[in-house]
């Protein structure tokens, strides 16, 4: 007798405020919707400012994001011990076959998930920037996380170059 195939469980981490418009959030939403249509079990962990108006039942709010000025813009991220506890709980309860972390080399839920996770981890890199002293200063903290990734994806050649310049590793461009 054939056993029915179990649906692959994929945990996706969005580093930026889910309810703030942005390219990373749109990328994650479209990918999640496509994977759900294909029969995968998807759970997205993200910072959320307004949980009451959250429309996607597959998004798990991790807490309110904190605005941080970066490169002339403001990134709404979540980081710290309370966020780390929520990340570990989400990973444990999700029992994921695979984790997909977006921007795993910035202080955010993605970095916390990388530190907490065991098993296959895919990292997608979106950012592109010139070499920055701050990255070199915290490189020893970030390097093990980047090295822990089973696979690395860059959304552009510029993002790939940024990854290579800062972490001396490579990624597949999609």
Regions found by a protein language model. Give the residues of each.
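Helix-loop-beta element that forms the nucleotide-linked donor phosphate-binding surface
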Residues: 148, 160-174
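Alpha-helix capping/helix-boundary segments
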Residues: 50, 105-106, 113, 158-160
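Short, well-structured alpha-helical segments in soluble
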Residues: 85-94
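Short His-centered aromatic/hydrophobic patch
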Residues: 80, 101-107
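N-terminal strand-loop element at the rim of the active site
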Residues: 7-8, 14-19, 28-29, 33-81
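Membrane-proximal helix-turn-helix segments that form the acceptor-binding/catalytic region
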Residues: 129, 135-152, 166
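Histidine-centered beta-alpha loop that forms part of the nucleotide-sugar donor binding/catalytic region
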Residues: 15, 102-103, 125-129
């Amino acid at each position: 007798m054939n056993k029915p195939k179990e649906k692959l469980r994929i945990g996706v981490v969005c580093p930026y405020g889910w309810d703030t418009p942005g390219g990373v959030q749109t990328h994650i939403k479209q990918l999640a919707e496509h994977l759900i249509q294909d029969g995968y079990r998807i759970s997205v962990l993200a910072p959320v400012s307004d949980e009451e108006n959250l429309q996607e039942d597959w998004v798990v709010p991790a807490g309110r994001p904190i605005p941080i000025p970066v490169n002339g813009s403001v990134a709404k991220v979540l980081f710290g011990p309370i966020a780390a506890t929520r990340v570990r709980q989400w990973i444990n309860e999700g029992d994921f076959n695979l984790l997909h972390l977006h921007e795993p080399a910035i202080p955010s839920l993605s970095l916390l998930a990388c530190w907490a996770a065991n098993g296959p981890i895919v990292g997608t890199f979106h950012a592109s920037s010139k070499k920055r002293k701050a990255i070199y200063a915290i490189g020893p903290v970030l390097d093990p996380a980047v090295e822990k990734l089973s696979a690395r994806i860059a959304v552009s050649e510029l993002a790939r170059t940024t990854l290579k310049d800062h972490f001396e590793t490579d990624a597949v461009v999609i």
